[in-house]
Amino acid sequence: MQEVPIVILDFGSQYTQLIARRLREVGVYCEIYPFFEPIENIRAKKPQGIILSGGPASVYEPDAPRVDKAIYELGIPVLGICYGMQLITVDFGGQVVRALEHEYGKAKLYFDPIHGKVCPLFEGTKDGQIVWMSHGDKVTELPAGFIRIAHTDNSPYAAIANEEKQIYALQFHPEVSHSQEGQKILENFARKICGITSKWDMGHFAKEQIEKIRQRVGEDKVLCALSGGVDSSVVTALLYEAIGDKLIPVFVDNGLLREGEREKVEYVFKNMLKVPLIVVDAKERFLNALQGITDPEQKRKIIGHTFIEVFEEEAKKHTDVKYLAQGTLYPDVIESVSVKGPSETIKSHHNVGGLPDWMKFELIEPLRELFKDEVRKLGLELGLPREMVYRHPFPGPGLAIRILGEVNEEALDLVRKADTILLEEIKAHGLYEKLWQSFAVLLNVKSVGVMGDKRTYENTVALRIVESSDGMTATFAHIPHDLLELISNRIINEVDGINRVVYDITSKPPGTIEWE
């Protein structure tokens, strides 16, 4: 079992993943587990420190989540954040009550020195720094052996410590960006208090993962579906580095790809990385299956079902395959275990869902310990071009769900050309990597126009350009009007069949990023 320098126990905070990301960004490897993780499992990971996350519960409620008190006896430092602080307070005999006024937002943090010295947790950070509060309960009485190490105007116990037991607790959230020096505080906990000296980065991860893959796969073969997206591209590059020709990467051209997408994928993997890529041309098959279909959900199901059929046929050609590779990421893994307890319904995550029963492959998920930004760094480490690693998310059903109405060659040609112009201009103006997604949608709407002296009655395209950090929420991008005008003029002048361009100014929620 891999050693984990910092174990984070999750009590359901919306910010828990941020704790892990902040620590990893400064080279400290950590993993998240539900608060009820058995103590023997935690001990087996040989952590040098434990962090108790925030959470929505109140510690004085009868069914409030609790931690096994044996974690305090492991002889390693513990840091509680928000709910974690309140839990530590109650576990050691202090008092927590419901606050008359909830405290949400920014506050100034002032240090309370210990024997004339600032607590090591705050070394290298400034007194009076801005921190982010988000709590409805407050500590009113400290447990025996604990002292105050920082306060705010509204929180007399903004940070507390029992230095003898190496237990520290913060009422604020150091993991969120609003806490000015929060990342430094977390780094101090890891480096100065827990004594972690190891530096974790993508170079180390790649070496470790390659060795693990080689040991596990041996002389067997691995099948991998390559879509050209970031995750599947990085999985393919990593596996090829590890096992070479024992990897069977399959790229299915469904005819629903963006301009030049197949060619780019073939160039990168066949020419640059020398990967023996299998390309299946299934354009006709997908378009025939989609004929006459206008309902978006039906489109998705048909595309998914057809992909499985094509992938299954290819898999049957390789009888000695034992493993199937998937690009599962760490957020998927975290979400699959509910903090509400083992009885809660588990949410499954499968990148290649609905595969037939006979395909009894063992799964290999080499990215399951990584966040998306780490996957991108790994891709660069493995030699993938930046353009591929930082490309915008592209939906599995491809352009089919960016065409409202029936999908056919004519519609695909229109949306593909409009999309290409949009992306060319976004890149030329240095905006591409600042945006989450930018694409064109062919609307099932025709309108009257005038071109030259002639009346036209042609198609409408909507431009969808959004900013987001994770795709869960998004806001429409405030693109300069002169750039929108340039894109619109180019599309109308260069793409026969389009005479109107509109800009989608809907955020998510209430809208979704994709139109279908």
Swiss-Prot record:
Q: Which residues bind ATP?
A: S227, G228, G229, V230, D231, S232, S233
Gene name as annotated: guaA
Q: What does this protein do?
A: Catalyzes the synthesis of GMP from XMP.
KW ATP-binding (keyword) present: yes
Q: Which reaction does it catalyse?
A: XMP + L-glutamine + ATP + H2O = GMP + L-glutamate + AMP + diphosphate + 2 H(+)
What is this protein's name?
Answer: GMP synthase [glutamine-hydrolyzing]
What organism is recorded for this protein? Nitratiruptor sp. (strain SB155-2)
Q: EC number(s) on record?
A: 6.3.5.2
Mind telling me which GO cellular component terms the entry cites?
A: cytosol
